[in-house]
Each structure stands twice: as structure tokens, then as C-alpha cells.
Amino acid sequence: MALTKADLAETLFEKVGLSKRDAKETVEVFFEEIKQALESGEQVKLSGFGNFDLREKSERPGRNPKTGEDIPISARRVVTFKPGQKLKARVEDLPVEK
């Protein structure tokens, strides 16, 4: 099961008392701010949670798995996430599902 934006909005509705419309809008605005910051090259730091960064990946050789043909993988920018210590501590000791 995955946590969705709808789940976050529902939690805001239940725990904070926002209307469903305001809760949904708050979640949308939150994620839009993160997207805009990353698009403009800024780091996103969420205290107690972690950091989102942009990393440059240079061009590298690749291979088409179906044909075996060598193809270049173009240079690109990727988003990385580094969890903060508090988040790491909360999930570190969770039991491992098999």
C-alpha cells in the first residue's frame, strides 16, 4: 500500500480540521512549491525528514536490452533524496517483511 496525496489531504481534513477542498489545495500547493524550487535549481530541505537535491549525470554508454545495440544515454539532471537522521531512526528498527 502507498501513501497518496489524497491520503494526505484526508489526514489534514481529519486532524487539522481543514475543509476537504482546502486540505486538497494545501497538499497540491505544498508539492507545487517543492517542484518549483527543484526546477529553479534550489535544494529542498525538510527539517526532520530529509533533503531533495538535483544531481547532474553525464552522458554514458548504454545498451538496448532487446537488441544488444550500444546506445548513448544522454546527460541529464536527476532528483535525489537523502533522508534525515530523524527519519532514518524511525525506520531503521522496523521489522523486515519477507
Swiss-Prot record:
The organism's place on the tree of life at top rank? Bacteria
Looking up InterPro entries in the UniProt record yields: Hist_DNA-bd, Histone-like_DNA-bd_CS, IHF-like_DNA-bd_dom_sf, IHF_alpha
Q: Which one GO biological process term can you cite for this protein?
A: positive regulation of metabolic process
Query: According to its UniProt record, what is one Pfam family this protein matches?
Result: Bac_DNA_binding
- Keyword Repeat found: no
Record keywords: Translocase included?
A: no
Give residue spans, biased composition: Basic and acidic residues.
Answer: 53-69
Q: Name one GO molecular function term.
A: DNA binding
Identify the stretch(es) annotated as Disordered. 53-73
Q: Which GO terms describe its cellular component?
A: cytosol
This protein's UniProt keywords: DNA recombination, DNA-binding, Transcription, Transcription regulation, Translation regulation
State the function annotated in the UniProt record.
Answer: This protein is one of the two subunits of integration host factor, a specific DNA-binding protein that functions in genetic recombination as well as in transcriptional and translational control.
How would you summarize the oligomeric state and partners of this protein? Heterodimer of an alpha and a beta chain.
Family label:
Belongs to the bacterial histone-like protein family.
Q: What is this protein called?
A: Integration host factor subunit alpha
